Regions:
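Glycine-rich beta->alpha junctions and the first turn(s) of the following alpha-helix
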Residues: 1-92, 165, 181
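C-terminal helix-coil-helix/basic helical segment that borders enzyme active sites and/or dimer interfaces
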Residues: 67-70, 74, 80, 91-147
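Secondary-structure capping and boundary motifs in well-ordered enzyme cores
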Residues: 21, 75, 85-92, 109, ...
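Glycine-rich phosphate/cofactor-binding loops in nucleotide/flavin-utilizing enzymes
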Residues: 5, 23-45, 139-188
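Charged/polar, solvent-exposed surface patches and flexible loops
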Residues: 31, 60, 64, 102, ...
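Short, charged/polar low-complexity linear motifs in solvent-exposed/disordered segments
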Residues: 45-47, 121, 131, 186
Length: 188
């Protein structure tokens, strides 16, 4: 990625201050980002026992703002498909993440899969926020007004906040590079 690059030319450090091997700073940086991603994933709030499945949350939002057909389905067939796709992708990531976390407990270190999870997870977070805004129509992008609910106002703020998830913890472009080299074994 051509942005957010920092180069230290002719930098001098004492040997005892060196982290990792000499001239292997990127390897140390990648490992740090890997642990940061792992910590971010673990710090997310756990699902409550009585929490509605995401499908119900998306569907109820869509029905509230867009209406429903005679069979109780979301009126807009395209958005209905988008809701199902988002929910299936989120569920697939959740199941795969659970499996890999269980496997990594035996190895003691996060594997290269965390780069995939960060990239896919952040993309799904971003697309989920975008979908929620689309489902709310014009109410999905309000900033302040007494005519809108606190939930509608927070939805807009969440959508804006979630735009950053593909950047922090290592941009998606950095993740793609790591995946290409470490997971797929592609050459530089």
């Amino acid at each position: 990625s051509p942005f957010c690059e920092t180069f230290f030319d002719n930098a001098i450090a004492k040997r005892e201050d060196l982290i990792g091997e000499l001239n292997q700073g990127w390897s140390v940086g990648k490992r740090l980002l890997q642990y940061e991603r792992n910590a971010t994933t673990r710090s997310k709030p756990k699902k409550k026992a009585n929490e509605k499945p995401k499908l119900n949350v998306y569907a109820s939002t869509a029905k509230q703002y867009l209406g429903e057909d005679g069979q109780g389905r979301i009126n807009d067939t395209d958005l209905r498909g988008d809701v199902l796709e988002q929910v299936m992708n989120e569920r697939a990531l959740s199941l795969t993440t659970t499996r890999v976390v269980e496997e990594s407990r035996s190895s003691g270190a996060p594997g290269a899969a965390t780069s995939i999870f960060k990239m896919v997870g952040s993309s799904l977070t971003k697309s989920g926020s975008e979908l929620k805004s689309r489902l709310r129509g014009t109410s999905g992008l309000v900033w302040e007004s007494n005519d809108f609910t606190a939930d509608e106002l927070e939805s807009t703020r969440g959508w804006l906040r979630d735009r950053a998830v593909t950047i922090y913890g290592g941009t998606n472009e950095v993740q793609q590079n790591i995946i290409a080299k470490r997971v797929l074994g592609l050459p530089d």
